[in-house]
Amino acid sequence: IGIISDTDAQPIIINSHLGRFAIVTVAKITNIKELEDELLSQNMHFAELSSSNTNQTELIALLIIQGKTFVEGIENVFKHIKGSCSMLLLTEDGSIIAARDQWGRTPVVIGKKEGAYAATSESSSFPNLDYEIDRYLGPGEIVRLYSDHVVQLRKPGEGMQICSFLWVYYGFPTSCYEGKN
């Protein structure tokens, strides 16, 4: 998860009342200008600018820190954005919070090997690292990965709407999406 981009540098590190965390996203937000204006009116600020544009990942992080917990913050993201956003957060305790967008458009895959769990958007990243696919997150599902177990923080919703372009345009050819290649 995350992108290589001149306009959306990732990961970014945030220090907030939730603690320090790093965040990466795969997002397409169509109401970013409205959200930016709303956050600025709440005396929030944006530090990650490139080509005079707001970094989507920073905007997502600012929506997250409006919550009392990471789960509440991620649900705040789902509530406010138009579009989709899947994300990974690396927390201070070394655990990873993985969240799939509420429509299930972009994949989040959990892999496991002895003594470790990992999350990715492309299952093809696992074999060379000796991981096996453990599961695919459902729409809106949130989990927390520790080295020896995974805790579900939010159950998946209904109505998977995976992006069909994965199979044709931008998905990696050797990756599996929802168990299909």
Please give the residue ranges for each predicted region:
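Conserved short alpha-helical segments that host acidic/polar catalytic motifs at enzyme active sites
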Residues: I1-G138, R144-N181
